């Protein structure tokens, strides 16, 4: 979906009490005789007079139970009805975008889905939505992923999904949640049908840019430039390298002074640090050349 950085490849049961159970729980209806009415009034005053063999307080409790059961049952029925209605709306939404042949939302349907959500398929919000839906593949939502995803964010329509975006973006800022999103992104970028175990370098670069939308590390631009120039000739990014880069951004300072090759970093990081330090030295030399030229010119003018 939004993460389509390259061309994409292609019941609830009702609850309720039985009528017989409801009827059996109802108290016997008292007659309106003068004697019972008098006992009721007296019982209210003394608190000890029995009505049908029961203390007044107990009788009141008994009388209230059928109402409580009825209200509780009604609430359950309303809850079940609301759940069924929500599932129906999710079903209608899914059918609006699903493929004609496959029971899933594919590339074309995903584009229409994003259009209706007013989001660009390549933006961070779409990646976050795919994360909450636990989508296994780019540009595809299976029926199960779509239904479980909608239920997980309490949404059953375009408007309700849109209303969840601010909260989802805030959730993705939490350290533990972002770590989960970050690791999900690697798996999401793989072509599961081809059994890929590493990300193509170009795909990895695009996904790194995307996943760090809200909290960009200071070293990210240099890292991506290194991968773009690709001096080491790598073709893919392994899961270990992907996961360790997040640790790298958290513990290694932007000046790289606390990086040590003796620690258990992927060898690609060693190459990157060496490349970056050489690049910085080269830039320093380049910056000094104009300064020297200006200095000589000033001396000539003084002479």
Swiss-Prot record:
PROSITE patterns: DCUN1. Residues 1-40 are annotated as: Disordered. Keywords: Cell membrane, Cytoplasm, Lipoprotein, Membrane, Myristate, Nucleus. One of its GO terms (molecular function) is ubiquitin-like protein binding. The keyword Plastid does not apply. Residues 85-277 form the DCUN1 domain. Gene3D superfamilies: Cullin, PONY binding domain, EF-hand. The keyword Cell membrane applies. Contributes to the neddylation of all cullins by transferring NEDD8 from N-terminally acetylated NEDD8-conjugating E2s enzyme to different cullin C-terminal domain-RBX complexes. At the cell membrane, can promote and as well inhibit cullins neddylation. PANTHER family: DCN1-LIKE PROTEIN 3, RP42 RELATED. May interact (via the DCUN1 domain) with unneddylated cullins. The DCUN1 domain, also known as PONY domain, mediates the interaction with different cullins. This is DCN1-like protein 3. It comes from Xenopus laevis (African clawed frog).
């Amino acid at each position: 979906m939004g993460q389509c950085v390259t061309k994409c490849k292609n019941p609830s049961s009702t609850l309720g009490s039985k009528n017989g159970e409801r009827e059996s729980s109802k108290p016997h209806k008292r007659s309106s005789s003068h004697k019972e009415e008098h006992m009721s009034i007296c019982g209210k005053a003394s608190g000890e007079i029995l009505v049908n063999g029961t203390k007044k307080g107990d009788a009141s409790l008994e009388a209230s139970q059928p109402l409580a059961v009825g209200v509780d049952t009604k609430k359950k029925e309303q809850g079940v009805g609301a759940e069924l209605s929500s599932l129906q709306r999710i079903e209608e939404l899914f059918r609006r975008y699903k493929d004609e042949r496959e029971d899933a939302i594919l590339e074309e349907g995903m584009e229409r889905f994003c259009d209706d959500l007013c989001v660009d398929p390549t933006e961070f919000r779409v990646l976050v939505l795919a994360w909450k839906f636990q989508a296994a593949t780019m540009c595809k939502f299976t029926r199960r992923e779509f239904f479980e995803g909608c239920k997980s964010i309490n949404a059953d329509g375009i408007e309700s999904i849109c209303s969840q975006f601010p909260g989802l973006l805030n959730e993705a800022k939490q350290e533990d949640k972002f770590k989960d999103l970050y690791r999900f992104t690697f798996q999401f970028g793989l072509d599961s049908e081809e059994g890929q175990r590493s990300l193509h370098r170009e795909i990895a670069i695009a996904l790194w840019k995307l996943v760090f939308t809200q909290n960009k590390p200071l070293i990210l631009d240099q890292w991506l430039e290194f991968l773009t120039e690709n001096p080491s000739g790598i073709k893919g990014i392994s899961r270990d390298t992907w996961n360790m880069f997040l640790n790298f951004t958290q513990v290694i300072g932007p000046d790289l002074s606390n990086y040590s090759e003796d620690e258990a970093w992927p060898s690609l990081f060693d190459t990157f640090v060496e490349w970056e330090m050489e690049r910085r030295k080269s830039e320093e030399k380049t910056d000094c050349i104009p300064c020297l030229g200006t200095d000589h010119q000033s001396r000539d003018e003084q002479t």
